[in-house]
Amino acid sequence: YYVKKHIEESGTGSEILEGRNILLAEDNDLNAEITEAILERAGIKTERVEDGIQCVNMIEKMPAGTYDMILMDIQMPKMNGYKATQAIRRLPDKDKACIPIIAMTANAFEEDKREAIAAGMNGHIAKPIQLDKLLSMLAEVIRQQENC
């Protein structure tokens, strides 16, 4: 209830988020559970993978357009978020390669943001997640993508 009410009052672009599908790449169960709950209350569907390799594999195997965006943790086992992003950006299917990817990480310094952008990510959100910032970032990235 709080998330829905907050979205309506804040004008963060809830209409643009409703019904979207996001692939969540997060190895920490608690972080994933919190993020999924926030997104679900905002009308966003999520599917979760637990490492960078699973994320790349999921994007490769699913049809382009299955997901509107990826929320990508940086520090994950097997393949970190930067390497997973770079692998996705190199995919031969350009519709899959250009999916918006947002870093979602405890690394909140300016250099971390620059590294995320340099890896090919479209944005950066710091943990712990702040509702306003997350929803605003998602709406902004979706708007930018629709204007491509």
Which stretches of residues belong to each language-model region?
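C-terminal compact regulatory domains
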Residues: 1-148
